[in-house]
Amino acid sequence: MLVNIIFLSSCSIQNERTAAGLNIEKGILFYSDENNIQEEDSYYEALIELKHSYPGQFDNYKIIAKNQEYDSAIASLNDTYPALLVIKDNKVVCKVVGIAKKDDILTPVSNVLEEWN
């Protein structure tokens, strides 16, 4: 099985894609494919742990379901499922994509959320 994981230098480099149309100062977007939910267990486990550790950072948290239509700004940020994006100042500062272990999701995302405290 092909594993597709993208880490942006410990999630510190800003991605070229922006969320400008969304006006997100700080936010977390989880792109979910409900037809392949079994592949997303590690993401849900990581999200539960992250929400427990950083409850204040989940004020602007949204699940983006693959089978639904969304604003073009949300759609332009990602086209791979599952994926977890962390947005700061309308830029993607952390992106984990594809099948990943819980720790491979937790580490980069925690590093970014820790900076927000």
Annotate the PLM regions:
Residues 1-4:
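Sec-dependent signal peptide recognition
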Residues 6-10:
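C-terminal motif of bacterial Sec signal peptides marking the signal peptidase cleavage site
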Residues 11-24, 106-117:
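N-terminal leader/targeting and pre-domain segments
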Residues 15-56:
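Local sequence-structure signature of Cys/Sec-based thiol-disulfide redox active-site neighborhoods
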Residues 45-100, 104-116:
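Thioredoxin-like thiol-disulfide oxidoreductase module
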